[in-house]
């Protein structure tokens, strides 16, 4: 995204540019909101933000793919539900930063990117993290990467209203070229795992199935709610804490809840097994585990 587009939109040069990548998850599906383990990697598709500070308390948000202002919001009036559409992810990030004590300045923001929307590649998390980086720079504030990821998640959870886990934002802030990110979503401890497929003559292929993926459509929230319900019935803080799968199955009489518990418990172990194989140099040995995921 060139600065010419910013000048065309706002009549002046930007002060800063920021970008954050999307992600794919190698293994560890539906485990992040169960305090489990995930193994994503950043991809060479990203959200990009150009920003310039304003002298007032207004955020003007424009998409590089449109000519009109998507949203113009008063920073002192931000509240969940006050901004619609994709601009809510931008405004929500400013709102979350303010709640953390950051004096977010007014700003003109031009947003672009090449992370496909609705394809399960975390375009929203990439946008939130890029906006957070740009606004923090304008505010003259530095925060740890983990704090940025958590604030981006808060924006999506509490402002936009999507009950996502924290994997996507951590992958966007902590992604490293040539590595997977092993994240314990309970301790929030990240560990980079070398991932050199080319050395094995392999390629990771990401395929767009054309099946729409929307976290806001209710299905994701329902799945998360069923996992939380199962944890309550089993008397554990989260499904991460289930240690005896057979016993857990016998305590549940609902097929859906049994399926949720079985997946989370076995998926957490598969993540750890994949990491062990990769660290032992056995990339090809991960295949059966990925198939079982």
Can you name each region flagged by the protein language model?
Residues 1-125, 129-145, 150-159, 164, ...:
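ATP-binding N-lobe of GHMP and related small-molecule kinases
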């Amino acid at each position: 995204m060139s600065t010419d587009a910013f000048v065309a939109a706002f009549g002046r040069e930007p002060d800063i540019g920021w970008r954050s990548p999307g992600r794919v998850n190698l293994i560890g599906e539906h485990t992040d909101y169960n305090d489990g383990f995930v193994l994503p990697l950043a991809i060479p598709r990203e959200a990009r933000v150009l920003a310039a500070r304003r002298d007032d308390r207004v955020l003007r948000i424009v998409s590089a793919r449109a000519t009109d202002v998507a949203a113009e919001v008063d920073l002192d009036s931000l509240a969940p539900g006050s901004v619609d559409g994709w601009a809510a992810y931008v405004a929500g990030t400013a709102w979350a930063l303010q709640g953390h004590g950051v004096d977010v300045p007014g700003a003109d923001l031009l947003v672009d990117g090449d992370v496909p929307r609705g394809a399960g590649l975390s375009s929203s998390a990439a946008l939130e993290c890029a906006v957070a980086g740009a606004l923090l720079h304008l505010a003259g504030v530095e925060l740890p990467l983990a704090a940025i990821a958590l604030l981006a998640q808060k924006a999506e959870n509490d402002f936009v209203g999507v009950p996502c886990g924290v994997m996507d934002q951590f992958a966007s802030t902590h992604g490293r070229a040539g590595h997977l990110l092993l994240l314990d979503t309970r301790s929030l401890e990240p560990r980079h795992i070398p991932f050199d497929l080319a050395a094995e003559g392999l390629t990771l292929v990401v395929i767009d199935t054309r099946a729409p993926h929307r976290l806001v459509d209710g299905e994701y929230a329902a799945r998360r709610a069923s996992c939380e319900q199962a944890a309550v019935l089993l008397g554990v803080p989260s499904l991460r804490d289930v240690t005896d799968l057979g016993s857990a199955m016998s305590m549940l009489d609902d097929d859906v809840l049994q399926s949720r518990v079985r997946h989370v418990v076995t998926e957490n172990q598969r993540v750890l097994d994949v990491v062990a194989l990769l660290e032992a140099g056995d990339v090809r040995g991960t295949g059966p585990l990925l198939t079982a995921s």
